[in-house]
Amino acid sequence: DGISLEDLLEKRTGNMMQPQLAEKIAKATRKEFVDGIAAHGTDALRFTLAALASNGRDINWDMKRLEGYRNFCNKLWNASRFVLTNDKLDLSQGEIEFSVADRWIQSEFNRTVESFRSALSQYRFDLCANAIYEFTWNQFCDWYLELTKPVFANGNAAQIRAASQTLVHVLEKLLRLAHPLIPFITEEIWQKVKGFVGITADSIMLQPFPQVEENGFDPEAEAEIEWLKEVIVAVRNIRAESNIAPSKGLDLLFRNLSAENAKILEKQTALLKAMAKLDNVQVLAANETHASVAKLVGNAELLVPMAGFINKEAELARLTKEIEKYQNEVKRIENKLSNEAFVAKAPKAVITKEREKQAEYQSGLEKIQEQYKAIEAL
C-alpha cells in the first residue's frame, strides 16, 4: 500500500534502542524517500522477496528491484490482455498446423517447469523467481507474442487455430506455475483465461500444479528459433547503428551459411522477412562480395546493402564526431590512470570503475570505427 514520509519517519525512529541515532536516520530517510514509499502491490513485494532469497546471505533490500518486479507484474497483465482481446483469436474445432514458434514456446515452457520444480525442491525461491521472470519477459512476451503477429496477419485457418491454442494454453499454465509467488494477479487473470481453455473450476488454487512433460521437449524447434532470433537481432542492430527506420524494408544477404542453417532459412524465410522487415533474402557464394554493412551470426556473415538508405557524407561526418568523442574519453581516462598521485590516493573501487569505463569506451570506439569503414566502402 505504500507509506507517507511522515509515517515512515515514525516507523524508523520510534521506540529505538539507540535514540541518539534518530536524527541521523531521519535525515537519511528524508533524502532517500522524499515522498515516502509509493504503493507497488503485494505481488511485486512477494516476487522481490523470493528473487532476493538466495541461500547463505542476508537480503540487501533494493527498491529498484521492487520497481522492476512491479513492472514485471504489469508486463504479465498487459501480455494477458493482448492475448484475450485479440479479435483474430480462433479456438474453434478444426485442422491445426503448429508453427516452429508454437513448438518452441511449448518446449521452452516445459524447460521452465523443469527448472522451477527443481529449484522448488531445493527451496531456492530465488531460482524459481528467475525462471518465471526469464520465460515470461524474455521468451513469451518479448518473442512469442511478436512471432504470432505474422500468423494472425497472413496465416491460414489451421495456423491461426494453432497459434490461438498455444497462446491461451501456455498462458494458462504459466499462471498456474507463477501462482505460488504472485497469487493475486495470477488469480485475477486466470479467472478471465479459464473460459478460453474450457475450465469451470472456481479458483486457480484448485488446479493441478504444472508437471514436466517427458515428450514436451523440442530441441529442433528451439535450435531453429534461437538462430532466427540471432539473425533478427543482428538486423535490428544494423538498423539502429545506421539510423534506418524500422518501417523501411531491407535486403539481407547471407554468406558462409552452413547447410543446417540454410535449411532453417529455406523453411522460415517468410517468418524472418516479417520479423526483420526484409524485402529480399539471398544466399551468396563464398567468394561473392557486396558493399554492405556486415554482422556475424556464428560463422555466417549477414550483409545489408545500404545504398539509398543513408546520406553517405552526412553519416561519415556524424561518425567522425562520435569517433572523436570516444577518443577523447579514452585519452582522458588514460591520463587519469597514468597519474601516479591519483592512483596512489584513489580508492581501489574508483580505479576499478575507471578501468571498466576505459574498456567500455575503447570497445565503443572500435565498433564505431567498424561502422565508419563499412559506410566508407559503400
From Swiss-Prot:
* InterPro entries per record: Anticodon_Ia_Val (IPR033705), M/V/L/I-tRNA-synth_anticd-bd (IPR013155), tRNA-bd_arm (IPR010978), tRNAsynth_Ia_anticodon-bd (IPR009080), Val-tRNA_synth_C_sf (IPR037118), Val-tRNA_synth_tRNA-bd (IPR019499), Valyl-tRNA_ligase (IPR002303)
Enzyme's top EC category: ligase
Under Pfam families, the record lists: Anticodon_1, Val_tRNA-synt_C
Which BP terms from GO are recorded?
Answer: valyl-tRNA aminoacylation
Q: What is the E.C. number?
A: 6.1.1.9
Which keywords has UniProt assigned to this entry?
Answer: Aminoacyl-tRNA synthetase, ATP-binding, Coiled coil, Cytoplasm, Ligase, Nucleotide-binding, Protein biosynthesis
GO MF annotation list? ATP binding; valine-tRNA ligase activity
As recorded in UniProt, coiled-coil segments are 307-377
Name the major location: cytoplasm
Q: Where in the cell is it found?
A: Cytoplasm
Q: Reaction(s) catalyzed by this protein?
A: tRNA(Val) + L-valine + ATP = L-valyl-tRNA(Val) + AMP + diphosphate
Q: Name one GO cellular component term.
A: cytosol
The Swiss-Prot or TrEMBL note on domains reads: ValRS has two distinct active sites: one for aminoacylation and one for editing. The misactivated threonine is translocated from the active site to the editing site.
The role this protein plays is: Catalyzes the attachment of valine to tRNA(Val). As ValRS can inadvertently accommodate and process structurally similar amino acids such as threonine, to avoid such errors, it has a 'posttransfer' editing activity that hydrolyzes mischarged Thr-tRNA(Val) in a tRNA-dependent manner.
Which family does this protein fall into? Belongs to the class-I aminoacyl-tRNA synthetase family. ValS type 1 subfamily.
The record's note on quaternary structure and interaction partners says: Monomer.
Protein name stated in the entry: Valine--tRNA ligase
